[in-house]
Amino acid sequence: MQLTPQEKDKLLIFTAALLAERRKARGLKLNYPEAIAYISAAILEGARDGRTVSELMNYGTTLLSRNDVMEGIAEMIHEIQVEATFPDGTKLVTVHNPIQ
């Protein structure tokens, strides 16, 4: 299977997000990479579903709360930027203060 670097990155994000989702479901608090992957994968899937950039920017702030992540993680993540593929092309989605 021949994959571009971008496709490999998306698969890596998805794999990390799947792990984070399972850990969250077991009641574990997410660490930094897990939180980033969890939100990033949701943004990528939302773009694939046809949501707009502004919808995804807002949606990204609703996915995790401070109770879902380890202590100090919310303060470490000021923004998350994801290059997502939309029906009309690739766009950069920036989620400011994603963990409320």
From Swiss-Prot:
Keywords: Cytoplasm, Hydrolase. GO terms for biological process: urea catabolic process. Its EC number is 3.5.1.5. It is an enzyme of class 3 (hydrolase). The keyword Endoplasmic reticulum does not apply. It is found in: Cytoplasm. Pfam families: Urease_gamma. GO terms for cellular component: cytoplasm. InterPro entries: Urease_gamma, Urease_gamma/gamma-beta_su, Urease_gamma_sf, Urease_subunit. GO terms for molecular function: nickel cation binding; urease activity. Pathway: Nitrogen metabolism; urea degradation; CO(2) and NH(3) from urea (urease route): step 1/1. NCBIfam families: PRK13241.1 (NF009712), urease_gam (TIGR00193). Belongs to the urease gamma subunit family. PANTHER family: UREASE. Heterotrimer of UreA (gamma), UreB (beta) and UreC (alpha) subunits. Three heterotrimers associate to form the active enzyme. This is Urease subunit gamma.
